[in-house]
Amino acid sequence: CITFLYTLNGKQLVTVENLRNGDLHPVQKAMVESDGSQCGFCTPGIVMSMYCMYENKVKPTNENIDKYLSGNLCRCTGYIPIKNSIKNMYNYKKNNSNQNNIITLLKKIKRNDIMIENNESRFFVHYNLKGLIKDYQKNKNSYLLVGGTDLALEVTKKRNNLKNIFYIGSNK
């Protein structure tokens, strides 16, 4: 929710709505079968955390479940049905019919350096260190951005206008 849009250049954004490929994704099926959702407010975040576990084939130990659910708050279920759904999600088969096409399309994306500006600020994305160093030296008093959980709050919560931001999370 605090990710700068520019940092998504050349990436696939997967949302809970995107998981369904003809049929529910295994994590969605597991949530339904285990009654893991009640009011639905927390469900998208929890399902996406489960999706990360599933896609990375993380063993559903109690420690891993707690780690992947951190940052998600559910006030209805008491977490037992959610944890049960995580333990059961590997019992469901995934429909992979679209995955190879997505991977092919992502590999075709040209990763060119970009600079986006408005009247007050500029945002740079560099994919090589040489270009980053060159532009950064020209723009002193700039901010370096990797993940953004600290810097993004300066914009979203404090409403500070950051003049020059260099995103280095895509740097090779």
For each of these PLM feature ranges, what is it?
Residues 25, 151-152:
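Residue-level detector of functional hotspots within protein domains
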Residues 39, 143-144:
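A residue-level structural signature of the nucleotidyltransferase/glycosyltransferase Rossmann-like core
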Residues 82, 150-151:
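Alpha-helix capping/helix-boundary segments
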Residues 106, 147-149:
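A broad, low-specificity signal for short, low-complexity segments enriched in glycine/proline
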